[in-house]
Amino acid sequence: MTLTVPCLFGLESLVADEMRRLNLKDVRVENGRVHCDGTLADIARLNISLRCGARVLMELGSFPARDFEALFQGVYALPWEDFIPRDGEFPVKGYSLNSQLHSVPACQAIVKKASARRLGEKYGLETLPESGSRYQIQFSIIKDVATLYLDTSGEGLYKRGYRARNMGAPLRETLAAALVTLSRYRGKDPFCDPFCGSGTIPIEAALIAKNRAPGLDRSFAAQKWKNMDSKLWLEAADEAMDKEFHGQYDIWGGDIDPAAVELAKHNAALAGVDDCIRFETADAGKFHRDSEYGQLVTNPPYGERLLEKKEAEELYRTFGAALRDLPPKWRVLVLSSHTEFERCFGRSADKKRKLYNGMIKCDVFMYGK
């Protein structure tokens, strides 16, 4: 079967690398999604182990759909009864892009009607109870080609289960993990985040250092599916836990807000990595480190939601000045949507990478080799 992992734009290559490390076959990249060939066992492995992907979708079929009749017949032809039991709940959601069928609510209604008719005929029911487990149907219609999926994840994979509550504008865990991955941090050198907020970046760094799978402390929609043996999930969890490392790590998170620091400590405890991270109330404008090597990965306020633009610019200037004394072998990654970040920071980036934080277009400014 084909499995599809949607992701934030700009993270496709990182997700593809993750899938290859899990020995998935025929990994293929498109804008905003990565495909592979897989099995039911791979559904469990991907959900438990992926750090940067948004969710895991099982592809059911693809066909041309230039009008509602073609959409109905294409959906009706799919073997829904092979996946959805007679009492299964099957809500529908999706999107359309550059297609004749552009009304998403109308397409949702057609997909629901066609799948319900097929299931009703197969089970001999005029009305389907939908009282059982949830089988979320997703569709995409791109350039008049419809693709139908079942969502195996349920809640997005960014919901690791450790964030008790948010401070201000939180960074999604999947994006935080991507930033840490881009820094090439592996747990050997010091790791710092001077704008740690609720602790997401240091926590994801600790999970990466320990090689702890991010999905071990949560549940997934497909765990309740009748065609997914619970043994597959236990085996995937055992495989992931067998890969964990146990060592000493120098991971630090600082924030000027004491309430944020306390929340970060609480979240780290929920994630089981509080023994790996030091959190402190600290001013990023006074950041200093003497160690020869290290990684600094951070997401300062952008001036769009948390601070006014001028305040953000002054913050970047102060922070940039503090980092001028950082030893030259440190690697620094800063996520920002500010178009004048480099000017304010006082240094041009050695490398930049475009990606999105939610709906905000950002750059990752990368310094160091």
Mark where each language-model region is.
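Accessory substrate-recognition/RNA-binding modules or partner subunits associated with SAM-dependent
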Residues: 2-135, 152-154, 158, 165, ...
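Short amphipathic alpha-helix with an adjacent loop that forms part of the alpha/beta core around
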Residues: 81-83, 286-292
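C-terminal edge-of-domain segments
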Residues: 137-153, 365
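SAM-dependent Rossmann-like transferase core, predominantly class I methyltransferases
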Residues: 148-184
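Conserved S-adenosyl-L-methionine
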Residues: 171-289, 305, 309-313
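Short SAM/SAH-binding signature in class I
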Residues: 293-299
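Long protein-protein interaction modules used by eukaryotic assembly/scaffold proteins
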Residues: 333-334, 367-369
